[in-house]
């Protein structure tokens, strides 16, 4: 009790490595990373005021259903005038802000990234700094939940394919580039780990 009163422990949400097959949290030490060939997609997010758009880069387009912001580096001159503007989240039609955060790398993709606090540890930390909402879009089996709109009930990778088709149909998909990255795997069953709140 004293630790709680001293502010050393607290109760609250936290993001963990989650195995959707074993249905258990996995420590950082138990995650095995494998290099995989994937893709980097550029997606158009239109400004609410109709004056243009910002293009974000992502390796996980299916998680955009839970986006609560777009982030740019505060030193990036390309985006100086759009910090504080709002964009419309494609497919979901939710208004989200463009924020500035030093975590964003100016030379990765377009220099603008989507912030999905319930699906990425870095985004979770950014959400705490900027007091952003956390929208969970997956259940413990990595199936899209009711917050995922048309993708509800779909496995994360089925949802990815359908989200990409919907983005292309709506004119939001700008580009797809080959991209190699490390993917966390469960050390027991080798299933892709899902960051989970």
Question: Where is each model-derived feature located?
Answer:
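Core structural elements
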Residues: 1-2, 188-192
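Short, intrinsically disordered, charge-balanced linker/junction segments flanking boundaries
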Residues: 193-197
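NTP-handling and nucleic-acid-processing catalytic cores
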Residues: 1-141
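A glycine-rich phosphate-binding loop feature that marks nucleotide/adenosyl-phosphate handling sites
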Residues: 15-24, 179-189
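The substrate-binding groove and active-site-proximal loops of carbohydrate-active enzymes
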Residues: 112-114, 146-156
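Phosphate/diphosphate-binding loops
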Residues: 155-183
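Active-site cavity-forming subdomains of large catalytic enzyme subunits
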Residues: 142, 163, 185-187
